[in-house]
Amino acid sequence: MANMFALILVIATLVTGILWCVDKFFFAPKRRERQAAAQAAAGDSLDKATLKKVAPKPGWLETGASVFPVLAIVLIVRSFIYEPFQIPSGSMMPTLLIGDFILVEKFAYGIKDPIYQKTLIETGHPKRGDIVVFKYPEDPKLDYIKRAVGLPGDKVTYDPVSKELTIQPGCSSGQACENALPVTYSNVEPSDFVQTFSRRNGGEATSGFFEVPKNETKENGIRLSERKETLGDVTHRILTVPIAQDQVGMYYQQPGQQLATWIVPPGQYFMMGDNRDNSADSRYWGFVPEANLVGRATAIWMSFDKQEGEWPTGLRLSRIGGIH
């Protein structure tokens, strides 16, 4: 499916690029000839402003040609180097918060054409623990961001009670799996975040996330628990809701596997949000094909204090920097 914004950007760049070339190689030489003739006739007494009036550049041509370099730079940077994204939900808390604006490294997993996202040059593959932006497999118009937990060939098991992972690499060949990956967890501690639950006037249930000092409470709120999860040599923080249990019946059940156990097929990945009880991820809809990968999240370049679907109430400049 074509990326409409990228398609419009490519078309605009091509059109303005043609105007730039036409001006540079056809109209500009003719203007210079007329200006030189006028200057010679006036005995070299004409200034630059007068010369421009002698051979003026049409407004439409000047606008199109002047916009081309800007559009070309935007197209190249956005398509092949870095693209900005906004975090719209709390599924990657505490690593990424609602209102964070991030930079995504587009060349991390391959150089792709900007319209259809077909890989032109392979540059790498997701590593375990990478924070990945990808096209949602069930609706490629949507961009999702999650952490790569399972790589091709991994056997991933999630315990919905302890909320812990078990990962065994090398299971896709039909032979015995390799030794389990060291997955360790720190002790559970109260986090800085409280999740609130309420209903709008129409009866629709809503939820919000607020940073609240540990010695304070918030009405209709539950303080989330936090712990460190280490997958091999990658450590990050995760959040859980103390009283929540996963809706295991809604898990994606892979044919031939027990519920809550998945073997990642070749060329696909198992993605999970760091906010484990508030993330719609591979547990519920399955794997992410390599063709859906957009890039790797690398940095926060701006952050607004806001709730999902609401206007910002302030800036969080302290969050600007690298993502881990």
From Swiss-Prot:
Topology Periplasmic: residue spans: 1-3, 78-324
Cystines in this chain: 171-177
Enzyme class (EC, first level): hydrolase
Subcellular location, record wording: Cell inner membrane
GO cellular component assignments: plasma membrane
Residue numbers carrying Blocked amino end (Met): 1
Residues annotated as catalytic: 91, 146
Assigned EC number: 3.4.21.89
SUPFAM superfamilies per UniProt: LexA/Signal peptidase
InterPro entries: LexA/Signal_pep-like_sf (IPR036286), Pept_S26A_signal_pept_1 (IPR000223), Pept_S26A_signal_pept_1_CS (IPR019758), Pept_S26A_signal_pept_1_Lys-AS (IPR019757), Pept_S26A_signal_pept_1_Ser-AS (IPR019756), Peptidase_S26 (IPR019533), Sign_pep_all-beta_subdom (IPR019766)
Bilayer-crossing regions: 4-22, 59-77
Highest taxon listed in the record's lineage: Bacteria
Membrane topology listed for this record: Multi-pass membrane protein
Keywords, comma-separated and alphabetical: Cell inner membrane, Cell membrane, Disulfide bond, Hydrolase, Membrane, Protease, Transmembrane, Transmembrane helix
Catalytic reaction annotation: Cleavage of hydrophobic, N-terminal signal or leader sequences from secreted and periplasmic proteins
A GO molecular-function descriptor: serine-type endopeptidase activity
Residues on Cytoplasmic side: 23-58
Family in the record: Belongs to the peptidase S26 family.
Protein name, entry field: Signal peptidase I
Native source organism of the sequence: Escherichia coli (strain K12)
